[in-house]
Amino acid sequence: MWRHFKSLWRAWGMTSRLDKEGIDLFHGLSNELPLTIRKARHTRSVVTIHDLIFLRYPEYYQWIDRKIYAYKFRKACEYADLVIAISECTKRDIISYFHIPEEKIKVVYQGCDVSFTIPATDEKKQEVREKYSLPEHYILNVGSIEERKNVLLAVKSLLRLPEEMHLVILGRRTAYTDRIDEFIHAHHLEERVKILNGVPFADLPAIYQQAKVFVYPSRFEGFGIPIIEAIYSGIPVVAATVSFS
C-alpha cells in the first residue's frame, strides 16, 4: 500500500521498518525525518538541512507549501539526535527560526563532483560547442531559472558589455523564464542569450571550462554548489555575497 503514497510512507510508515531491520542510524539527507522516528526503539537519527529559504523569502512559495515545509523541517530538527547544516548561514537560520540549540548543529560543507576538476579533452569541448551552438565568448549561469536566482540581472548586464560577449543559461525553465524572454525580445538580445534545458551532466564540465566567467546573482542560497563547480573548473566567479557564508 505504501508504495502508492511515498511521501506519507516517509513521514509515517518508515519507523516500523527501522525496528524490523534493526537499523542503528537513520540519516535524513534532505530536510526531513519520519514524524514517528522517536518511536524507533534502537535507531538514532541525523538530518541534513540545506536551507530555510521558504522562511527567509516566503513570497517565492505557495502558502500551503510554506506550512508543510515549516512543520516537517522543524520537527526533523527537534527529533534528530544531530542536525547537519550545509553552511554557517543555514546553521544561523536553524537557530533563529527553530530555536534549536547550537551545540546540536554541526556544519558540514558541500562539495561537487570530481569531474569538474578534470580538464575536458579538446574533442569533448568541440563536441559540446557544436551540440549546443555555443558562442566563442560567453558568460555562464547554471541553476533553476526562478525569481530568487535573479538571472534577469545577468541578462540586463549584457547591455553594458561588448557585443561579442554572450550569456549561456543552463537550467529548468519556470514561469520566471517568461520575464527573461520578454526582456530579451524587448532589447533585441536574441543573438546574445542562449537558454539550455535538460543538459546531460556529462556535458557540464566542458561547458563550464569554456566559459569566460561564471555569474551567480542569486538573492539567497543555502550554499550554492554551482559556484564550487565553477571554481573547480578554473573559471572566474562573480556572485552575490548576501548569503554565501
Task: Show which residues each predicted segment covers.
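Carbohydrate transferase catalytic cores enriched for Leloir-type hexosyltransferases
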Residues: 1-245
